[in-house]
């Protein structure tokens, strides 16, 4: 209270360094210690009873004992003062007043939040103050509520700071409270008049409301008074109490805290921030930073406390509010945090940056509250709602529903509640309380009194982080805030008016809850409806429902509403609860007629669970009970009809449900677990409420086994030992009797999507399907018709495109000038045409129903579209306002997109659809694929138009991006175009294209690019329709392959995979697999886009021209089986032959195609024995004249044959053979004469190279890989030809061989195929007879008669044993040459399986059969030896030196020839006979004179022909070389000349460049040196830094280890420091109090010293005046005898003048001492004041006085006076406060100066004699001690104890003389048995004083004494007027009885004479004798005594 404030008032935030040094230790009172020790810390208490009880019991007692009667006098005296203060205050500017209010708020809240000193009245009265300071950092939620309430009260004054009426009222209330006048009514009315109606209910709910109000009014009154009366500037006072040292230290600690915070060392940061707060406790930033640290550390209550402190220090700081709200939300107080956030936004509205953060926080808090409301909690949601509103009941005036119902039950039995004061003292005297209630009906309104129950708590979540939630009261089910006025009216009134009012309130709340329930139910807010109905059921009791005038059916309808709400929620728990509620209606309320609705509800529950059979049973039961419905029902207390209660509607609804249950949908899966307990249902639906996914296992035999996930886990646990799902692959199928292998496992998640999939491909061999062949048109008419159709289609396509283009242009023209009166049909047609531009939108419109079925959560879709700005806020509101919102939302959005025709919004809608999690898994892939088109098109778009995009101003794009997508996507500030080209930024790239499209007006250069992106690149889903069938629906377009037919002579492309053996036929040969795949992949007919037409036309032209040069490969069809591969090869060759006709085996087409065959294809052909054998394996192919042809064209080829009968020609030739041999000349141009070499060395090399002697015959399989490699070698030119012929051969004459229709056996087929272009032809039958060996199967030799190049066919015969002699040479088949290519040879080896191959001796024989075809087609028989075979084999090798391209072929054929043995050579002659004469004897001699042996002539002709050709070629080459060389020479000369000229020009440039290069090199060298020097320096620095860092790292490691090893020490040190800090703070407080007390005592002591000095000097002067009066009296007596004394008149005059001078000196001395006393009281020190100067007065010279007369007349008085003067002088000498300097000037002059007589000396001698009577044992040595240097000018050197006693008694009783006092001393000594031993001077003085007082009581007033009394009256008046008590005048050594020497402070006029405490209020009493006492102390004294405790005076009348 202000009355308790000390004089030196310092603000509470003064730092410790600024004020700590001035404090002394100790001084804390015992009461304060007890208060600090005994004060409890109760975290959940609101106000401790003994906290305010004592003070306010006294206040109440004083008020009702009559103190309040003094208010009239008080009001009259203070009225004008309040008015003046209020006017001066309100005259100041409003801004200054508001700043003052903020400063006053800090004064009020400082002891509550920042400084916890319980000695102040604020902290004692306020419940928020913590008692234990170690926990002062935390503030409990309940105390925080009181702090906020206190803050609201304090903020009221700021609102009305310049309102004179309210300010004046505030001052009046403050004065009343200070003077202990109860002013509760005035205080509450003042709050009510301010206009804030929310504070009064809050105050009513708090027990400590009155202390808050008293603190508010008194503090504001005090500070306003200070501002006005003392002209105190609170703002300056607040700012100036921080020294620079504290500011610097605080900033240093703050910076260190910031550094630790940046390192995320929050605990250390908290320590530094705390140290900074100790230096600067008024800095709000420090509390905010520390709150943030606490938030990061999870200490939310500490963060809450610091956030509140920061707000109090600066309420316009947004960050403080933000952290405060964060802490509240972390503690679960979301509603509270939301309210605090709203208040913060109002306070911080001038800070735009901070308000943004607060708004975001507001949105986040709202979302959290919505999420909490959406979840099902354990508590009653309605209870939680009302509990959250309990603390601030702004909108509810009626009591809570449950509480009201309880009151209805007990309204007649309540009892009167005991009245309690607002301070919460429950143990007060009931009588006093009742008197208070009766005495003043207005001071305590019932409206503002608290209820008797436990005070409410602010609730958020049920439990906060620190478990601070309150347990519910045991008396009531819920703890709710109730309207206080209505509760008190119920409690204090028994009238029926209260009950009626309560009933009205109950019905009002009942209607409100029912309305909330059915409204939420109609709007499908099922959770809100369930909450409302649950609250109703919790409040309603069905047994007492009639008390509310409600029927039982109303209660049943509430139960039905709850069940329907739970059914609408749809979760398994809610569905079970709904089923229970419906069953409850059936079982407990069967008479209400709602059985039909209950059975229907149960059926709906089962239908939700997809249990169709159970649902069908209940629906059928409900159909039978429709007749029992009571009629159309409405919701209770309303007129809203329940639609289900209409019989016709129920009937229709039940029929619909029954039909649905009779024909249920196909389940998505069926659980196969035998013990499946899935709610009696093995069917699995994705829409099951309890759907948690399932697993599907498939095997290769198409079995599907499915399980619930729970069933699958059980099955794995019990049967498969928890086997991993993936391990089931390749296992046996789980289906019984199935032998398949598990090939696929799919696991579906709870959302219905594929969670994971495992697959193992099991390849099943299938029979090759017969390819679909496209036959050629057989007639020209059909070809012409086909071409006409193609042309017609082409024309129609062009017309359709043209028509579409015209329609688009027409729509554009119509859209530019809008016509308001346009018909609806035109709009629709234009709209349909417009969709051709945006194909995505067209697709969305056509599939709207599917999209509608896909979306399962429409609210999420709409929110996302709203966030993407596809929908505006108005559209969103319009969509939500629809009653059928859920079903119409998607339709509305699609219609909106169609109306907008915005390409970007359409694609955003598609993107949002694809991002939705709750999508139907059946259509989700289609939507995602549709959405992926745009993502795939971004790459080509940026590639094509990257140059145009780089020219854009990215600042504008960045701004537009932030405006459009800143809230959804990250910022693109600082990013370039390359960022969007990255694969990871595809989404951002597409959004950039969307942004450019939306702002296309700003980018005109990109119009065409954007149109291309949205029309073509991003719209692959639809294409142009065929114009010839416009009526056909779009989805029914027939897919037709439009592959272009090639011309008959063009080669078809073939698909040959390079890595796999696969051949795919062209488009005209379609297999069923290809047909199916094409049908599945094609989405419709294909139209070539405009931008690709030119490229396609060029491609087609090139394709038609070079179709035979393209080879396409395909790798897909060769993974099947070999049969399919062979079939594909047959198809391929069929197409080839069909296009090109019959082909020769040596045709280039075969060789070129074979080169590109993969390895597997070649192996297939090799296994078959070559291409010919392979093709003959298929019945489609035949061989005609060594030409491969199709069987269907064989008849045509036979007609064209020129030689029809080969056998006849052979016979004719054999008959005329002799004639031909003699007569016919040789034909030099014959085919056999064409040489096969290019040089003459060919013939020489034939015999020079021997064949392999010891070559074994490897198996045919071993030859295959080697010969395959040979087939890949290149071919030589056609000019190089080689023929292996014996030189003795005559001119050969041969004929064509006829083909054999019999196919060759398996063992006689060719074993390998050497060349790709050499294929075997038809077979020739060669019989072997008469060799003396066993008859063997005939051998077959493949012949190729149509090949133009030579071909060597080696036919190894059987190995012949040595026991069989060879009588003659073996006839063999003559060889022939049938090849046109120099490097080609076809060698086929075969061996009969009947020949003996096991006996492989060295005498193997082999012959080579060379079949030569002559110009006449004759074949002769020849026999060759082994040597001839070697020659024949070696000749090609010799030729290979000149034919480099055939080297590898010949090497392979030499190495791999089998059957060549080392048989002795036999004569080898080439037999040139006809085939018919092969077994007859013929002349084979050489033809002389032309040849020495057979064949020489032919050999020579061949050589000459070869040489001539070589010469001709050489001449041609020489001419060409000369032409080329001359041309090259000219070109080189020109180049040389140009180079010379250029060198001349470039030489000076080179020199200049070299010079510049030298300069640059020098410069670079210099820079290099500098850089190297810098590098060296940097390396040194780096090395130093590394060393330093290593050392610091080692130190840090050491420190870390120390810190880790000593965690407990840090805790101990911290606790020790905390204790030490507490002790230091305690010492500081004690020192401060001791300092204040010592200062007061010092002032009192200095005042007492000055008063003693004043009395001493005055006594001296009074003694002189007394002597002067005595002398003057004597002179006046002698004046009668004028003769004897002639100068009497003159002496009288001089003595009178002396007497007046003494009187003036007395007054002057008093004035001087009074001035010094005032100066000391005002703050001066005694040592600083100048000493009081007292002038020395001398007695006037008077020789006429007779000494005897003088002694006789004044022996009594003079003696007393002299003793008094001596005693006063002794007192001055014994005064310890008088120093040597001051003692000289203040001594009283001796009376003997100027006096003719020596009476003073005689008086002194008399007193010495009296003092000598005291025995030495009675003398106190302490009383005899005298300081050195303090002696009087008399001869007395020491003062005995008797003189000290006399001095003390003279001061107390100045009216007695020293002789009388000596007599009193003797009497007291006689009573004490003549001894004062053991008694101190003080005790003796006390006894003598008591004796004198008793004597005065006994004696009556004596007339004789009046004279003495009147004479001594000046001295008594001086003593009475002195402010100090008489007993204290004896000096500071005077002690009272029972007091210790050091405990008693110096007595003062401002302290009580009994308890010696300084008066701190007006509660004091002054007696007539001048002594002052506390009223309480004096009353206690009067109980046993009736005299003054100090002087013993019995006159106790008050002089107040």
Curated annotation (Swiss-Prot):
SMART domains, sorted: RING, TPR
Biased composition (Polar residues): 1059-1070, 1829-1839
Residues bearing the modification Phosphoserine: 397, 1029, 1080
Reactions the enzyme catalyzes: S-ubiquitinyl-[E2 ubiquitin-conjugating enzyme]-L-cysteine + [acceptor protein]-L-lysine = [E2 ubiquitin-conjugating enzyme]-L-cysteine + N(6)-ubiquitinyl-[acceptor protein]-L-lysine
EC supergroup of this enzyme: transferase
A Pfam family it matches: TTC3_9th
Compositionally skewed regions (Basic and acidic residues) per UniProt: 1894-1911
UniProt signal peptide: none
EC number(s) given by UniProt: 2.3.2.27
InterPro entries registered for this protein in UniProt: DEATH-like_dom_sf, TPR-like_helical_dom_sf, TPR_rpt, TTC3/DZIP3-like_helical, TTC3/DZIP3/RBM44-like_helical, TTC3/DZIP3_dom, wHTH_TTC3, Znf_RING
Zinc finger (RING-type): 1952-1991
Protein name: E3 ubiquitin-protein ligase TTC3
Gene symbol of the encoding locus: Ttc3
């Amino acid at each position: 209270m202000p009355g308790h404030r000390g004089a030196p008032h310092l603000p509470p935030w003064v730092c410790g360094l600024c004020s700590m040094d001035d404090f002394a230790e100790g001084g804390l009172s015992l009461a304060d210690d007890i208060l600090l020790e005994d004060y409890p810390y109760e975290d959940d208490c609101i106000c401790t009873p003994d906290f305010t009880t004592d003070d306010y019991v006294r206040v109440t007692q004083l008020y009702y004992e009559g103190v309040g009667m003094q208010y009239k006098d008080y009001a009259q005296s203070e009225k004008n003062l309040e008015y003046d203060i209020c006017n001066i205050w309100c005259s100041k500017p409003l801004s200054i007043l508001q700043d003052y209010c903020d400063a006053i708020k800090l004064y009020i809240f400082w002891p509550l939040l920042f400084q916890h000193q319980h000695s102040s009245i604020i902290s004692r009265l306020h419940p928020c103050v913590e008692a234990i300071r170690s926990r002062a950092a935390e503030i409990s939620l309940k105390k925080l509520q009181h702090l906020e309430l206190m803050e609201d009260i304090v903020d009221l004054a700021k609102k009305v700071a310049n309102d004179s009426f309210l300010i004046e009222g505030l001052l009046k209330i403050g004065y009343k409270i200070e003077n202990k006048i109860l002013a509760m009514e005035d205080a509450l009315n003042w709050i009510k008049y301010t206009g804030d109606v929310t504070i009064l209910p809050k105050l009513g709910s708090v027990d400590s409301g009155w202390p808050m109000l008293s603190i508010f009014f008194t503090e504001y009154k005090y500070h306003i008074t200070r501002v006005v009366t003392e002209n105190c500037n609170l703002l300056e006072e607040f700012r100036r109490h921080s020294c620079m040292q504290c500011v610097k230290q605080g900033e240093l600690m703050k910076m260190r805290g910031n550094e630790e915070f940046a390192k995320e060392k929050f605990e250390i940061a908290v320590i530094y921030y705390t140290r900074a707060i100790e230096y600067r406790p008024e800095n709000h930033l420090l509390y905010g930073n520390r709150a943030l640290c606490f938030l990061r550390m999870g200490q939310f209550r500490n963060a809450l406390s610091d956030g509140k402190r920061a707000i109090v220090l600066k309420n316009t700081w947004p960050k403080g509010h933000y952290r405060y709200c964060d802490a509240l939300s972390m503690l679960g107080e979301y509603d509270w945090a939301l309210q605090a956030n709203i208040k913060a936004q109002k306070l911080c509205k001038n800070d735009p940056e901070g308000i943004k953060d607060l708004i975001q926080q507001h949105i986040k808090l709202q979302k959290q509250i919505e999420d909490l409301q959406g979840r099902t909690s354990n508590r009653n949601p309605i209870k939680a709602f009302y509990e959250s509103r309990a603390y601030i009941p702004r909108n509810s005036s009626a009591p809570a529903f449950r509480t009201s119902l309880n009151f209805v039950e007990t309204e007649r039995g309540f009892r009167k509640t005991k009245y309690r004061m607002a301070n919460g003292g429950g143990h007060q005297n009931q009588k006093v309380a009742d008197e208070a209630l009766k005495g003043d009906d207005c001071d305590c309104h019932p409206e503002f009194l608290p209820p008797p129950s436990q005070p409410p708590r602010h609730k958020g979540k049920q439990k906060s982080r620190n478990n601070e939630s309150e347990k519910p009261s045991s008396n009531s089910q819920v703890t709710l805030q109730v309207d206080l006025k209505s509760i008190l009216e119920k409690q204090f009134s028994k009238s029926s008016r209260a009950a009626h009012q309560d009933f009205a309130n109950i019905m009002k709340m009942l209607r409100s809850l029912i309305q909330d329930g059915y409204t939420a139910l109609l709007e499908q807010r099922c959770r809100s409806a369930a909450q409302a109905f649950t609250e109703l059921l919790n409040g309603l009791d069905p047994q007492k429902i009639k008390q509310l005038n409600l029927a039982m059916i109303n209660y049943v309808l509430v139960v039905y509403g709850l069940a329907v709400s739970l059914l609408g929620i749809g979760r398994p728990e809610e569905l079970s609860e709904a089923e229970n509620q419906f069953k409850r209606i059936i079982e407990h309320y069967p008479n209400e007629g709602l059985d039909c609705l209950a059975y229907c509800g149960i059926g709906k529950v089962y239908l939700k669970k997809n249990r169709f059979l159970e649902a069908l049973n209940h629906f059928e039961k409900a159909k039978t009970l429709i007749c029992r419905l009571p009629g159309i029902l409405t919701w209770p207390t309303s007129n809203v009809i329940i639609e289900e209660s209409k019989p016709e509607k129920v009937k229709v609804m039940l029929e619909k449900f029954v039909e649905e249950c009779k024909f249920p949908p196909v389940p998505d899966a069926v659980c196969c677990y035998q013990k499946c307990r899935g709610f009696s249902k093995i069917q699995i639906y994705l829409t099951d409420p309890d759907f948690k996914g399932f697993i599907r296992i498939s095997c290769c035999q198409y079995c599907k086994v499915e399980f619930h996930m729970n069933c699958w886990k059980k099955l794995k646990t019990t049967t498969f030992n928890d086997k991993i799902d993936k391990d089931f692959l390749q296992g046996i199928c789980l289906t019984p009797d199935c032998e398949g292998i598990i090939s696929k496992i799919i696991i579906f998640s709870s959302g219905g999507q594929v969670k994971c999939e495992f697959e193992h491909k099991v390849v099943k061999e299938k029979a090759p399907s017969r390819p679909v062949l496209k036959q050629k048109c057989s007639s020209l008419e059909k070809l012409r018709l086909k071409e006409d159709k193609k042309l017609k289609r082409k024309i129609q396509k062009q017309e359709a495109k043209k028509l579409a283009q015209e329609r688009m242009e027409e729509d554009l023209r119509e859209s530019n000038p809008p016509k308001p009166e346009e018909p609806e049909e035109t709009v629709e047609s234009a709209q349909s045409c417009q969709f051709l531009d945006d194909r995505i939108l067209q697709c969305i419109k056509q599939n709207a129903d599917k999209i509608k079925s896909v979306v399962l959560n429409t609210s999420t879709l709409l929110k996302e579209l709203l966030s993407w700005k596809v929908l505006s806020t108005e559209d969103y509101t319009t969509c939500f306002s629809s009653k059928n919102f859920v079903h119409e939302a998607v339709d509305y959005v699609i219609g909106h997109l169609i109306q907008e025709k915005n390409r970007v919004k359409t694609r955003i809608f598609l993107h949002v659809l694809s991002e939705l999690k709750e999508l139907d898994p059946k259509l989700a892939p289609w939507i995602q694929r549709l959405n992926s088109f745009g993502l795939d098109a971004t790459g080509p778009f940026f590639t094509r138009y990257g140059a145009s995009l780089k020219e854009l101003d990215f600042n504008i794009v960045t701004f537009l991006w932030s405006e459009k997508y800143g809230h959804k996507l990250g910022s693109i500030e600082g990013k370039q175009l390359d960022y969007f080209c990255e694969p990871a930024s595809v989404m951002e790239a597409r959004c950039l294209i969307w942004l450019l499209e939306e702002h296309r007006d700003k980018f005109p250069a990109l119009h065409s690019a954007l149109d291309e992106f949205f029309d073509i690149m991003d719209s692959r889903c639809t294409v142009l329709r065929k114009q010839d069938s416009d009526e056909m629906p779009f989805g029914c377009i027939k897919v037709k392959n439009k592959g272009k037919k090639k011309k008959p002579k063009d080669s078809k492309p073939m698909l040959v995979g390079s890595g796999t053996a696969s051949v795919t036929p062209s488009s005209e040969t379609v297999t069923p697999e290809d047909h199916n795949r094409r049908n599945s992949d094609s989405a419709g007919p294909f139209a070539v886009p405009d931008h690709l037409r030119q490229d396609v036309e060029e491609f087609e032209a090139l394709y038609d021209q070079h179709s035979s040069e393209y080879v396409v490969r395909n790798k897909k069809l060769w993974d099947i089986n070999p049969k399919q591969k062979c079939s594909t090869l047959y198809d391929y060759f069929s197409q080839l032959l069909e296009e090109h006709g019959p082909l020769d085996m040596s045709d280039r087409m075969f060789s070129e195609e074979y080169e590109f065959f993969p390895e597997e294809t070649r192996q297939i052909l090799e296994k078959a024995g070559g291409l010919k054998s392979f093709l003959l394996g298929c019945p489609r192919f035949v061989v005609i004249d060594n030409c491969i042809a199709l069987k269907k064209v064989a008849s045509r080829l036979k007609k064209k044959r020129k030689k029809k009968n080969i056998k006849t020609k052979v016979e004719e030739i054999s008959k005329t053979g002799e004639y031909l041999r003699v007569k016919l000349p040789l034909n030099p141009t014959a085919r056999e004469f064409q040489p096969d070499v290019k040089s003459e060395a060919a013939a020489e090399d034939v015999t020079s190279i021997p064949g392999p002697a010891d070559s074994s015959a490897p198996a045919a399989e071993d030859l295959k890989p080697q010969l395959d490699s040979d087939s890949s070698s290149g071919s030589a030119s056609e000019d190089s030809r080689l023929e292996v012929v014996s030189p003795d051969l005559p001119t050969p004459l041969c004929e064509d061989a006829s083909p054999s229709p019999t196919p060759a056996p398996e063992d006689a087929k060719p074993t390998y195929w050497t060349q790709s272009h050499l294929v075997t032809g038809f077979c020739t039958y060669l019989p072997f007879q008469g060799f003396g060996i066993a008859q063997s199967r005939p051998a077959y030799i493949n012949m190729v008669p149509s090949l133009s190049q030579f071909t060597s066919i080696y036919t190894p015969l059987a190995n012949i044993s040595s026991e069989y002699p060879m009588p003659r040479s073996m006839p063999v088949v003559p060889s022939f040459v049938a090849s046109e290519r120099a490097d080609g040879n076809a060698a086929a080896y075969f061996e009969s399986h009947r020949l003996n191959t096991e006996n492989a001796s060295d005498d193997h024989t082999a012959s080579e059969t060379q079949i030569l075809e002559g110009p006449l087609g004759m074949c002769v028989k020849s026999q060759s030896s082994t040597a001839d075979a070697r020659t024949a084999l070696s000749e090609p090798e010799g030729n290979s030196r000149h034919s480099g391209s055939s080297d590898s072929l010949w090497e392979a054929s030499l190495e791999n020839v089998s059957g060549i043995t080392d048989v002795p050579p036999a004569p080898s002659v080439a037999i040139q006979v006809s085939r018919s004469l092969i077994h007859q004897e013929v002349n084979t001699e050489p033809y002389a004179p032309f040849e020495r042996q057979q064949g020489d002539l032919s050999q020579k002709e061949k050589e000459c022909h070869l040489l001539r050709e070589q010469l001709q070629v050489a001449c041609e080459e020489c001419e060409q070389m000369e032409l080329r060389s001359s041309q090259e020479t000219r070109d080189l000369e020109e180049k040389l000349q140009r180079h010379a000229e250029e060198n001349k020009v470039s030489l000076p440039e080179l020199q200049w460049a070299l010079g510049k290069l030298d300069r640059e090199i020098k410069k670079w060298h210099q820079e290099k040196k500098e850089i190297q020097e810098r590098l060296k320096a940097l390396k040194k620095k780096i090395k130093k830094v590394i060393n330093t860092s290593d050392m610091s790292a080692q130190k840090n490691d050491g420190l870390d280890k120390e810190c880790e090893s000593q965690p407990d020490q840090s805790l101990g040190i911290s606790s020790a420091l905390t204790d030490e800090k507490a002790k230091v703070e305690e010492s500081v407080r004690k020192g401060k109090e001791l300092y204040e007390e010592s200062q007061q005592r010092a002032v009192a002591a200095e005042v007492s010293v000055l008063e003693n000095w004043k009395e001493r000097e005055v006594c001296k002067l009074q003694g002189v005046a007394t002597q002067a009066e005595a002398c003057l009296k004597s002179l006046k007596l002698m004046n009668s005898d004028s003769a004897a004394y002639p100068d009497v008149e003159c002496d009288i005059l001089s003595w009178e003048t002396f007497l007046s001078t003494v009187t003036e000196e007395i007054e002057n001395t008093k004035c001087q001492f009074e001035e010094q006393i005032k100066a000391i009281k005002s703050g001066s020190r005694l040592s600083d004041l100048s000493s009081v100067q007292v002038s020395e007065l001398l007695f006037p010279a008077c020789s006429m006085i007779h000494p005897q007369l003088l002694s006789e007349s004044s022996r009594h008085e003079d003696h007393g006076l002299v003793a008094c003067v001596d005693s006063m002088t002794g007192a001055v000498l014994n005064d310890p406060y008088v120093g040597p300097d001051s003692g000289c000037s203040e001594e009283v002059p001796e009376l003997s100066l100027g006096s003719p007589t020596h009476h003073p000396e005689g008086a002194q001698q008399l007193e010495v004699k009296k003092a000598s009577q005291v025995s030495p044992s009675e003398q106190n040595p302490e009383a005899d001690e005298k300081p050195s240097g303090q002696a009087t000018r008399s001869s007395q050197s020491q003062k005995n104890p008797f003189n000290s006693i006399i001095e003390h008694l003279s001061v107390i009783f100045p009216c007695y003389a020293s002789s009388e006092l000596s007599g009193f001393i003797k009497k007291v000594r006689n009573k004490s048995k003549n001894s004062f031993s053991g008694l101190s001077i003080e005790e003796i003085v006390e006894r003598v004083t008591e004796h004198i007082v008793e004597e005065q009581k006994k004696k009556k007033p004596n007339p004789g004494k009046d004279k003495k009394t009147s004479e001594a009256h000046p001295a008594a008046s001086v003593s009475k007027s002195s402010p100090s008590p008489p007993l204290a005048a004896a000096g500071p050594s005077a002690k009272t009885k029972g007091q210790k020497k050091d405990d008693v402070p110096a007595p003062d006029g401002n302290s009580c004479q009994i308890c010696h405490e300084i008066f701190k209020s007006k509660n004091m009493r002054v007696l007539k004798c001048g002594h002052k006492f506390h009223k309480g102390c004096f009353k206690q004294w009067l109980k046993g005594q009736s005299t003054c405790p100090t002087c013993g005076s019995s006159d106790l009348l008050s002089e107040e």
